[in-house]
Structures are given as structure tokens and as C-alpha cells.
């Protein structure tokens, strides 16, 4: 079955930034435009200036005990995410032989996961999923595929649990980046890539590396983690989510692309169209993190109906 997505109405803007007058206004990189929301401006989701710890979002330089752990996480990630490692993980987890369960069962399982790479929140993951989904649902009530995408975008983090192989957090969470080409300096804590074997490999350390310009992100190997795993689960289990939804799942942690604007030379035209939706999604993914809990039982029936619409009852994981 093919699902068509109504293209958003676009307004011309020139940069991805917060407006000084309205912190909820989202502006997009490279002249991309913002889809008009279905709610009035006064009712729309406002991006807060501070995270749950009272600090700026994605501030990796402020000194704190949590930040020390985040930096150590990125040191390990940057050293160990190599082409060979990614190939090994893709082969292992591509078997989808870890478990059979429903999407909602996986949501509940995610309660056991706390993301050590996240400087903004230390809450159970299901709350972040519901916070993102409910914020999008309010502003874009007619885009049900986007609501569901928000709900499931982080489900791949279950691969850090013992029943899924118990991967270390550096192989599950954090910002993602291409392997097989040069590590762009926009990557958080870039200095640690010097200890990555691929950094010194002449086949991999040029701008294009093993890829060609405009080859399309689908042909690019990303650092292994929950993004690629959940994309694989959705694709191989026959999800009918539209291309934009699957793109969001696969690249929502690719901050060097969707926030810094790097690696665009690897994109094709379809990637560029889908990136517009990812820019929309990122506002809610990043800024909806808070200590205010969503009533799970109250919203569960709605999301169960979306799961039934876009996914089989049980999936191979």
C-alpha cells in the first residue's frame, strides 16, 4: 500500500534559528521553508530556552558531572565507530532475530533506557517520545504519520538492553555521522576522531571518501546506532510510513547535517525534500524535552490506532 503525504505550505525563510521576538518560530537552513502549522501562533508549541537542568540545549561545553559523562561517551563513540564496525553491526542486527513484539510493547520496554549522551534530559525515553509526539500532534493535527514517527523515532535504543545484545551506549545513542569519508569538524567533540583508525585511512579520510557527490544518503553508511536500527526494523517489517517518516527515523540524530548544514554534498533530490520535514521534526525532538509527564494511558488509544494503520501487529526486531 502506498501512503501519499500532502506537501506542506511553505513560507520563504533564510536561516535555521530562533527568532528574537518569538522563540517558537523555526527558520530553516539554506533557504528551506517552514510548513505552516494548523494551529494559531498563540497556541503553537513554544521552544523553551532552557533544558530540564536549567541550561541551554545541546550545550556540550558547560562544566557539570553529567557533561563529563557525555564527553566520555563521545570519546568512546568517535574512537570505535569505524567502517568495519558499522558493517559488522548491520550484518548482525539485520537478521532481526532478537525478539518478536509490537510497537507499543517496545515503547514500554524503552522505559528501562536512559540516554547517557543526552545533556538535556535524564528521564525514561517513553516520556520523551510522547512529549515530542503530543507537541507535533497539537501543531500538525492532520499529519498523523508525523505523530507516529515522533512516537517511534527512538525505539531503536532498546539495543542497549541485554535481550537485544546489550550494546554499549556509544553504539546506540548520540549524534550520528557518515563513516567511510572525512569526519567533518561540525561533529561534537571532533578532537576524539584522531584516535579512530579510519581517520588515518587514505581511502576514508577525504571529503567524499568511498562515496560520490550526490550519491544519496541511502548509499552512505552512517555510524551505527538506534536510528539505523529502527529504520531497518520499520523497512523490513513492511511499514507503510511515507518516505519522509522513514527519513526522519534514520537521520534525526544526524545533527551535522540537519543543524550544521554539512555533508549536503552526499544528498540527492529526494533527500533534500525529506530534509525539510526533518527540520520541522527536530524542533519538537529537541525542545519538547521536559520534566512534565504525559499521561500515557490517556493518549495510548490514539497512538495504538496509528500503529495499526502503519505497522503489522507484531514485528521482528
Swiss-Prot record:
Expressed in flowers, leaves, siliques, and to a lesser extent in roots. GO terms for biological process: inositol catabolic process; L-ascorbic acid biosynthetic process. It catalyses: myo-inositol + O2 = D-glucuronate + H2O + H(+). Binds 2 iron ions per subunit. Keywords: Ascorbate biosynthesis, Cytoplasm, Iron, Metal-binding, Oxidoreductase. It is found in: Cytoplasm. Signal peptide: none annotated. InterPro entries: Inositol_oxygenase. Fe cation 1 binds at residues 128, 153-154, 285. GO terms for cellular component: cytoplasm. The keyword Oxidoreductase applies. Its main location: cytoplasm. Pathway: Polyol metabolism; myo-inositol degradation into D-glucuronate; D-glucuronate from myo-inositol: step 1/1. Belongs to the myo-inositol oxygenase family. Catalyzes the oxygenative cleavage of myo-inositol to D-glucuronate. Involved in the biosynthesis of UDP-glucuronic acid (UDP-GlcA), providing nucleotide sugars for cell-wall polymers. May be also involved in plant ascorbate biosynthesis. This is Inositol oxygenase 4. It comes from Arabidopsis thaliana.
